[in-house]
């Protein structure tokens, strides 16, 4: 199944009243150029992820066993939030390497939490075993068409909030967010992808011509460190995103600090990557180009930004 503007519009209608319409602002002298920022860090749970979680949940027949997901970060929190809001049970498999603060937030939403020794791959394996036993509905963090379409509803808001928009910069992890936004705009607006140099999974896939397993790490690995991009997300990015640029960890940290210094906003590393691309010169807007960066999340320790 491919994802297009009709799917994104249907998702927007489906999740209406469930998610916040997040603001766009011109956040001071962040770049030396006129750049707008879409503040998805102000979304429920602190990231864009509830959009896709709600759309997948509300467009599916949910079995008695409820929903199931593997995530140590924003998606697990979003699934727990969406499940609670719709009266559905949720079990989230979380790697033992995840910060306890994030685990506590998932539990606070009422989800059952299963801690798995190891990393995300081990959590996914444990999830697959449990799903086979229970038949619970799988919620994938980025590679389901319903999730992609839900994330794409950000594009609808951008159309309404910035009608003269030329370009939007979006960070890439597994590709669900940028694929959804690109699917909505369908080349009417330029969509630029941003990856950390140390987690350049989409770049590796584009070079190989297909999704491949890549080494990931760096300051934004907790949100942008998918070792392989999605089978659904890859062709959308390949066909509708140009270019994909790379940013260093120092540039990401600098963008986080700029959000704090200019706007008093706590933006997580993955959420600051789009701004880092402009501040570092990885993407240079043309004269008069109307540009928006997506601040996709704010779930990090404030002390890492403000100190």
State where each predicted segment sits.
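PLP-dependent amino-acid enzyme catalytic core
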Residues: 1-307
């Amino acid at each position: 199944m491919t994802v297009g503007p009709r799917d994104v519009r249907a998702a927007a209608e489906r999740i209406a009243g469930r998610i916040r319409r997040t603001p766009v602002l011109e956040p001071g002298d962040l770049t030396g150029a006129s750049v707008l920022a879409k503040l998805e860090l102000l979304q429920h749970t602190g990231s864009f992820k509830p959009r896709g979680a709600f759309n997948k949940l509300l467009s599916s027949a949910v079995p008695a066993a409820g929903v199931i997901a593997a995530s140590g970060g924003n998606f697990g929190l979003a699934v727990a939030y969406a499940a609670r809001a719709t009266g559905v049970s949720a079990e989230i498999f979380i790697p033992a390497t995840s910060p306890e603060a994030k685990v506590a937030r998932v539990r606070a939403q009422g989800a059952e939490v299963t801690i798995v020794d190891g990393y995300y791959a081990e959590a996914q394996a444990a999830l697959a075993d449990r799903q086979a036993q229970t038949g619970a509905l799988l919620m994938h963090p980025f590679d389901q068409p319903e999730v992609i379409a839900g994330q794409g509803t950000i594009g609808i808001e951008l159309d309404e909030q910035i009608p003269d928009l030329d370009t939007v910069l979006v960070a890439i992890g597994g590709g669900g967010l940028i694929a959804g936004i690109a699917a909505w705009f369908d080349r009417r607006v330029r969509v630029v992808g941003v990856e950390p140099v140390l987690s350049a999974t989409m770049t590796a896939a584009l070079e190989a011509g297909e999704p491949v397993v890549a080494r990931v790490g760096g300051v934004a690995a907790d949100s942008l460190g998918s070792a392989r991009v999605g089978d659904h997300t890859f062709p959308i990015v390949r066909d509708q995103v140009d270019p994909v640029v790379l940013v260093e960890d120092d540039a990401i940290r600098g963008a986080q600090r700029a959000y704090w210094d200019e706007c008093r906003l706590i933006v997580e590393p993955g959420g600051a990557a789009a701004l880092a691309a402009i501040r570092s010169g990885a993407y240079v807007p043309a004269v008069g180009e109307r540009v928006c960066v997506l601040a996709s999340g704010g779930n990090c320790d404030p002390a890492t930004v403000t100190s």
